[in-house]
Curated annotation (Swiss-Prot):
GO molecular function: NADH dehydrogenase (ubiquinone) activity; NADH:ubiquinone reductase (non-electrogenic) activity; quinone binding
Transmembrane parts of this sequence: 3-23, 61-81, 88-108
Protein name: NADH-quinone oxidoreductase subunit A
Any coiled-coil regions, as ranges: none
Taxonomic classification: Bacteria, Pseudomonadati, Bacteroidota, Bacteroidia, Bacteroidales
Keyword annotations of the record: Cell inner membrane, Cell membrane, Membrane, NAD, Quinone, Translocase, Transmembrane, Transmembrane helix, Transport
Source organism: Bacteroides thetaiotaomicron (strain ATCC 29148 / DSM 2079 / JCM 5827 / CCUG 10774 / NCTC 10582 / VPI-5482 / E50)
Gene3D superfamilies given in the database record: NADH:ubiquinone/plastoquinone oxidoreductase, chain 3
Class in the EC hierarchy, top level: translocase
Cellular compartments per GO CC: NADH dehydrogenase complex; plasma membrane
Main location: membrane
EC number(s) stated in the UniProt entry for this protein: 7.1.1.-
Compartmental location: Cell inner membrane
Length: 116
């Protein structure tokens, strides 16, 4: 196969992106002041340090939320096409659901759902 056309298109696209970025940096107005580098919080002036550590519990809840959010992202399309999939589709989604329930049981047993 001849990939010359593909290489030319990719190089042209990269060159275009590079020119646009360079042009925007060259002609964009700049204003350096202290307020530009402060964290913006709902229009209210910040109190204390802007960068602070969060407890690990927040990250654990976020990961659990993402896990079950992805579950619903898989369940909705499955529900739409479940009539066309037949028994094999039912078995596969049940297997997927059982794995997620086992993951939830494991997180519950380890105390991940309790705020400490």
């Amino acid at each position: 196969m001849n990939f010359t056309f593909l290489v030319v298109v990719l190089l042209t696209a990269l060159a275009f992106v590079g020119v646009v970025i360079a042009l925007s940096r060259a002609i964009s107005p700049r204003s350096y002041n202290v307020q530009k580098f402060e964290a913006y919080e709902c229009g209210i002036p910040t109190r204390g340090k802007s960068w602070m550590q969060f407890r690990v519990g927040y990250y654990l809840f976020a990961i659990l939320f993402l896990m079950f959010d992805v579950e619903t992202a898989f369940l909705f399309p499955w529900a739409v096409v479940m009539h066309d999939m037949g028994p094999q589709g039912l078995v596969s989604i049940l297997f997927f659901f059982i794995i997620l329930v086992l993951g939830l049981a494991y997180a519950w047993r380890k105390g991940a759902l309790e705020w400490k």
